[in-house]
Swiss-Prot record:
Cofactor: Mn(2+)
Assembly, per entry: Monomer.
Pathway in which the depicted protein is active: Carbohydrate degradation; glycolysis; pyruvate from D-glyceraldehyde 3-phosphate: step 3/5
Positions annotated to bind Mn(2+) 2: D14, S64, D441, H442
UniProt superkingdom: Bacteria
Function in brief: Catalyzes the interconversion of 2-phosphoglycerate and 3-phosphoglycerate.
Annotated residues for binding of substrate: H125, R155, D156, R187, R193, R259, A260, D261, R262, K333
Record carries keyword Glycoprotein: no
Reactions accelerated catalytically: (2R)-2-phosphoglycerate = (2R)-3-phosphoglycerate
EC assignment: 5.4.2.12
Organism: Pseudomonas putida (strain GB-1)
Family: Belongs to the BPG-independent phosphoglycerate mutase family.
Keywords in alphabetical order: Glycolysis, Isomerase, Manganese, Metal-binding
Protein name, as recorded: 2,3-bisphosphoglycerate-independent phosphoglycerate mutase
Amino acid sequence: MTSTPKPLVLIILDGFGHSEVPEHNAIFAANTPVYDRLRATLPHGLISGSGMDVGLPDGQMGNSEVGHMNLGAGRVVYQDFTRVTKAIRDGEFFKNPVLTGAVDKAASAGKAVHILGLLSDGGVHSHQDHLVAMAELAAQRGAEKIYLHAFLDGRDTPPRSAQSSIELLDATFAKLGKGRIASLIGRYYAMDRDNRWDRVSAAYNLIVDSAAEYTADTAQAGLEAAYARDESDEFVKATRIGEAVKVEDGDAVVFMNFRADRARELSRAFVEPDFTEFARARLPKMAAYIGLTQYSAKIPAPAAFAPSSLNNVLGEYLAKNGKTQLRIAETEKYAHVTFFFSGGREEPFEGEERILIPSPKVATYDLQPEMNAPQVTDRIVEAIEQQRFDVIVVNYANGDMVGHTGVFEAAVKAVEALDTCVGRIVDALEKVGGEALITADHGNVEQMEDECTGQAHTAHTTEPVPFIYVGKRNLKVRDGGVLADVAPTMLQLLGLEKPVEMTGTSILVDA
């Protein structure tokens, strides 16, 4: 019999950062007796989940994909954002054979290049500098018809902040002497990830057939009209800009988001021959449909930047050592606790089980701030009591998903719901002698108002995240930890040597 405490639970509180500023801080405002008690009585500290510490540009806020990659890999994972930006700076982007091949096919036949993507400086799913570079590449290679179908952000950026991004792209096209913004739509429609196909169909029909609820002469005018209708960037309805632009046979389409999870549904509509999620009015015979990165191995679209493989991530190494593991989350974060935590692998490892709890079907999560966290917790408590698993990895989506709504009162309720859930897990572990690590992937809910603009702060933050050890061992939390140190910490608690690929080091040291 092993003497290792069982199970070891990694609790990832999504979007749950730490800020010393009490104003507009949903964690500070919430009643959190469990969290307060754990921090008062157990080894705890703060670790970094942003910038260079997670493989992003310095000062860039973290996000869920990046956070889970680093948590599961046990090493700093240099992100697609960083790879693409570097390629643009050193000129390799403009020689990328996937991108140049697609553009050349269309341009040589006098056809159009359509650029799709989130027009934003948020850096979470995309970056506007990448869209600028793609427009420049298309122009350099002789494309005369270059159209940007812009998805507006307002979620990883302030709710009404798209004007400067539109101005940047308008200026880019003016400088190039060709190309223009052809359509606007909020990311709520174009970048769904929860099978709300009515939203995706609005984006698809806008891009392919220029079918729009609204029209405007310029993108600036379209944005102003949306604001007059009280639509913030995220929720801007399908708007045609200028003369109708359709995706015709022989055109090339390039999707410039680098993050996969919110690019999959729209991409499927473009490339799956037997697509049935909604009735496509038309499926053009494109010269090429390209993703900036690989959105899924199952989506038949070449990637300009192919995934770099990660070996001996935590899940794989646990399987090699005969350990069992459970991954559990609700829909919104299921991909993060499985695909991203496993280093970009879709299939479970040997001895790995997965539980998906459907997210509630509400328009926005401020309407149900507890989401389905209680049901997630029911399944975790059950798994702890059964003692079938050596390791349980759970993601609670509330801090991030409710934080993104910008509704402070709802965010406070979300934090209080999390506190109750964590308390139930800690109680269940106490009964069986298990252990837990409580942390987060990035900040969000600790800052709910932008101190500069006074607008709701709906984006992630660069704040550090909590790290708490729940267990009986005489340990303390060292300073200077990062997300990549969490997997090595778990291996230490499990009594396993870390593999050579894991360059992170344990956050827990002898007290």
